[in-house]
Amino acid sequence: MQFLHNKNVFALLLSQSFQSLAGVLVTIVLMVRIYQMTDSVFLAGLILSFMSFASIAASFCVSPVLRILGFKKVLAGANLLRAVFIILMAYSVTHHGQAFFWITLLFVFCFSFAGAFFQPARFALLPIIVPKKQYVKANGVISLSNQLFLTAGWGLGGLLTYAVPFELVVGAAICLFVLSGASISVLHVNEEEAAGTAETASVRSIWKDLMIIPIVRDITVMDMLEALAGSVWSSAILLAFTAAVLHETEVWWGMFNASYFIGAIVGSVIAIRFSSFFERNMGYAIMFSSLVMSALTLLFSFSPVPFLCALACAAMGPFYQVRDICQETMLQEVIPEQKRIGIMAAKNAILTPWSGVTYSIMGLVADAAGAKIAFIAAAALYIMTFLIALAQPRLVHYRRENRVQ
């Protein structure tokens, strides 16, 4: 993995890992704290809602801010700002009263607004610091690192909120964001070249490009369908399936979650190991993964044996990761260089709030028809993404020479 000796790649990887872990810890500790203070699931859930609103708002100014201030200043500064907002959130959330609650949500909005700059910028920076032939491998390594740190964050976050004082968890998150910003500060990029990836066109033009570049449009639609399908794997629906359909305890519920994350990590390793194969067959990998995920979801929904369900979860992880890595690589290649940041910010502005809505939709399906029907509906949605890919020859038969100029 020679490209990891590239200091720029390593710095970007380190920065993302630190900020991913810190972001998860902050989300968990805030939601738990607010729930303990208010005894309201709705009020605790407003944390995620305000984070989504911030992502939408940030999508309209990511490109101009990065173009004017430069990548390093914005990314390093954003991480340091997030550390400051954690301090402010920690102060306000420890005070009772409606006013302090809304002040906390305001700080949550600012915290997430600053964080919304990272992913579009990282998406645009990677093709600048990595040769094209290493896109799949680089995306695979970053995805693997992200999965490991997210797994650690969600796995340990709940435990830490109960076993470790609130102030220590907050302090750890602050340190992680400072380290993330410090990692970005050692990044060496040509700011003029990087600024060329920040679109100077109007917001309307960026959203128009999102809809008229065929592969970008198709992948966005597929992502929306797969987000709706994937919401059945949320903790609440999966727990209901475990209890009502399998008649098992929370132990198996935890095993299903763990199995998927293990599979996702394996998927990233597979994408790295066989990157040259996936580079030649990205379209087929995306299409085939959707088909297999549909089959595995059906297997999960109809299997009466918990062990087989756990195997289905583990098997789904690699296909999901390979598809995700191939999609990101394909987007990096087909989106014109100067439009990468704007288009990805617009795409995230669609998918972030949509992801929140999907949990409500599938939750209603599970309440009305049962958890098993919700999983069968998810399998049907995966089939729809397979059919969309199958109906788009330019996506299925994608070759690098198809890149939009």
UniProtKB/Swiss-Prot annotation:
UniProt GO BP: response to antibiotic
Similarity section: Belongs to the major facilitator superfamily. Drug:H(+) antiporter-3 (DHA3) (TC 2.A.1.21) family.
UniProt keyword annotation of Calcium present: no
Record localization: Cell membrane
Gene Ontology terms for molecular function: efflux transmembrane transporter activity
InterPro entries, per database record: MFS, MFS_trans_sf
Keyword entries, A-Z: Cell membrane, Membrane, Transmembrane, Transmembrane helix, Transport
Organism of origin: Bacillus subtilis (strain 168)
Gene: yjbB
Full protein name: Uncharacterized MFS-type transporter YjbB
Keyword DNA-binding in record: no
A Pfam family annotated for this UniProt entry: MFS_1
Primary subcellular site in the record, as a coarse category: membrane
Transmembrane portions of the chain: 9-29, 41-61, 74-94, 98-118, 138-158, 168-190, 227-247, 252-272, 291-311, 373-393
Topology in membrane: Multi-pass membrane protein
Signal peptide: none
A cellular component term, taken from the record's GO annotations: plasma membrane
